[in-house]
């Protein structure tokens, strides 16, 4: 891993100084804020290559301001092979080349703030891309220090360890011949699930979140955040037909046993130190389950 950036190495939570003007959450500005979602790829193309980009968004800030919006929520702009519209992230601290550069992002952030607009980013931390440096290392061997960053299990005769079906298609387990093991992916096989049971993974994520907040972003929309804690028994799911021949993993992954513990830790280590907004995507949550968040 020599020569790779800090994001790709285990690290403790970054105890950074609050930037000038940033304070611990003391207001409820977000309660009355009007949020406008931007899908960068189709919003505005600034250079004529047929793909929307960050500079295109910057060029339309005055227009967005006239709409009366307060917050711009950006769908993922991180580096990604784009197997799932950017929700498969290969580097949390880099911008997808289709959209521009980090300098372009910083200019967008600065110009938005000048106009009284806030920027909220998608936060995708249930899984990464299989092209992320962590996963490339994880699959090399069972003794690799990154092995436990993901959820690996052995089945019998190279078969999946249980009958869970992916929310996209097929089995939720992908066989990897290198170590004769399967890794879990609730979504595409290109999106291996992170192992939130591993405190090193959580430290990596909190450090990354702090890095973006130190840049001045105004919060996160947390993608499928209710899925980060899995039932560690990994029992078979009920076969209902919804996943074909496979079982339903939903009862063992949604609103899992440690999800609130993890989010409370995230709040202590990162979120409570900034005047920001957060929104959590919690698929299929009941009113009672939602209230716990």
Predicted features and spans:
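Cationic, low-complexity basic patches in intrinsically disordered or flexible, solvent-exposed regions
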Residues: 9
């Amino acid at each position: 891993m020599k020569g790779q950036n800090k994001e790709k190495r285990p690290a403790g939570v970054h105890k950074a100084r609050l930037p000038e003007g940033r304070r611990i959450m003391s207001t409820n500005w977000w309660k009355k804020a009007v949020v406008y979602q931007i899908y960068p790829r189709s919003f505005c193309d600034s250079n004529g290559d047929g793909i929307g980009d960050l500079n295109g968004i910057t060029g339309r800030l005055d227009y967005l301001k006239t709409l009366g919006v307060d917050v711009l929520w950006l769908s993922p702009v991180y580096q990604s092979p784009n197997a799932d519209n950017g929700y498969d992230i290969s580097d949390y601290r880099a911008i997808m080349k289709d959209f521009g550069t980090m300098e372009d992002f910083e200019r967008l952030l600065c110009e938005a703030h000048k106009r009284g607009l806030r920027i909220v980013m998608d936060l995708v931390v249930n899984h990464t891309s299989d092209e992320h440096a962590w996963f490339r290392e994880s699959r090399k061997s069972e003794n690799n220090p990154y092995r436990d960053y993901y959820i690996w299990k052995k089945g019998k005769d190279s078969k999946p360890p249980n009958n869970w079906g992916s929310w996209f298609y097929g089995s939720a387990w992908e066989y990897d011949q290198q170590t004769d093991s399967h890794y879990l992916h609730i979504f595409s096989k290109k999106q291996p699930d992170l192992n939130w049971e591993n405190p090193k993974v959580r430290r990596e994520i909190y450090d990354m979140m702090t890095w973006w907040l130190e840049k001045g972003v105004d919060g996160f929309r947390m993608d499928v955040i209710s899925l980060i804690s899995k039932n560690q028994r990994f029992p078979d799911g009920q076969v209902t037909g919804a996943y074909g021949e496979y079982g339903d993993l939903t009862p063992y992954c949604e609103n899992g046993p440690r999800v609130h513990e993890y989010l409370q830790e995230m709040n202590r280590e990162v979120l409570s130190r900034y005047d920001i907004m957060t929104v959590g995507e919690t698929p299929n949550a009941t009113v009672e389950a939602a209230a716990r968040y």
